[in-house]
A protein has these predicted regions:
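Membrane-embedded transmembrane alpha-helical bundles that form the catalytic cores
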Residues: 1-336
Length: 336
């Protein structure tokens, strides 16, 4: 079941979260029930009629892949966290980072069109259908960012259960927004009062309504009455120009609607997941646009790729000009 893909998902999710909401209004939180409902929703999200074990749709291959992936990442992160005080060498950091990214790299290689007709098959299905799972990129971004923060020493404490919670948080598991571990744990530790939770619920309701408007009304109309007719005749500059803008608007309203749903359900858990969009089409320039479009991903690349590349070049004095180093870091950021 695709998260936020149909009304059935919303109905099931809201029923499952009803005890969470009731406890929230009482100024309480059950970490045990939160864990149970998260596990239930993850099983539902990864359910599959085609690729499963023992002909059980809820025992899907994607679910098994996800569990193995989470165990892999938790073992890597906890190993690095506990061994860092004794040995914080660059080689160990790189090794852990490579091992963390390895599952995603494997999935991307298997998905690549470079393989063409040479895709590896298993029982008449592509191997990639068994290896990957929905949201592997965004979960990997979380793990990589966490390893970097351990390296920097900005994270002082990591508990296994909190780490699993962070990686497998179901509202944002498929396509973000990408949260930060310290911010997530801070919200998770602080149980809001009844009045504070009431404000979160009101904001969540507003975002869900706005998300329905964006994704199921505006995006639908753009796709039905602009994109699909234009696809029938893409000859000529005007049609190509109209198609480009129509598709850009469709992407925004579809993805922004999804992001609003993800943030709203996060709020119902008492987790204030950061926003993903801030009126991107009002941007004054390309830099301002990327600071408004898919912000959590843009900021992730800025903090984890651009700033670190620039800092490394500055420390090693690889180039004399700060401007040149900034441009190189910018190119590395966009290449990745």
């Amino acid at each position: 079941m695709i998260p936020y893909g149909d009304f059935t998902f919303f109905l099931i999710a809201l029923i499952a979260l009803l005890p969470v909401i009731i406890l929230g209004f009482l100024g309480k939180r059950s970490y045990i029930y939160n864990g149970v409902v998260t596990a239930f929703m993850i099983v539902l999200i990864f359910s599959s009629d085609k690729h499963n074990l023992f002909d059980q749709k809820y025992l899907s291959v994607q679910l098994i892949s996800f569990i193995i992936y989470v165990v892999w990442q938790v073992l890597l992160i906890m190993f690095y966290y506990h061994s860092k005080p004794k040995n914080n060498s660059f080689s160990k950091f790189v090794t852990v980072m490579v091992l963390s990214i390895l599952p995603l790299a494997l999935v991307k290689v298997l998905q690549s069109t470079w393989l063409g007709g040479h895709q590896i098959h298993f029982h008449e299905s592509k191997l990639i259908e068994f290896v990957g799972f929905l949201g592997i990129s965004y979960v990997t971004f979380k793990s990589v960012q966490l390893i970097m923060e351990i390296r920097d020493g900005s994270i002082k404490e990591i508990k296994v259960w909190k780490l699993i919670q962070f990686i497998s948080f179901f509202p944002t598991i498929s396509s973000g927004p990408i949260d930060r571990y310290k911010r997530f744990v801070k919200d998770d530790k602080k149980v809001p009062t009844g009045n504070e939770y009431r404000e979160l619920v009101l904001k969540a309701i507003h975002m869900i309504m706005l998300g329905f408007l964006y994704k199921y009304i505006v995006a639908y109309f753009i796709n039905t009455y602009a994109i699909m007719p234009l696809q029938l005749d893409l000859h000529g500059f005007v049609n190509l120009w109209l198609y480009m803008y129509a598709y850009s608007l469709y992407l925004f309203f579809d993805f922004a609607g999804y992001s609003l749903f993800a943030i709203a359900f996060s709020y119902l858990f008492g987790i204030k997941t950061p926003p993903n969009f801030d009126k991107p089409f009002k941007a004054k320039n390309i830099k301002d646009f990327w600071n408004r479009w898919h912000m959590t991903l843009s900021f992730w690349f800025r903090d984890c790729i651009y700033m670190r590349s620039l800092f490394y070049m500055s420390r090693k004095k690889l180039l004399k000009s700060q401007f040149a180093m900034s441009n190189v870091a910018f190119l590395i950021n966009f290449f990745i």
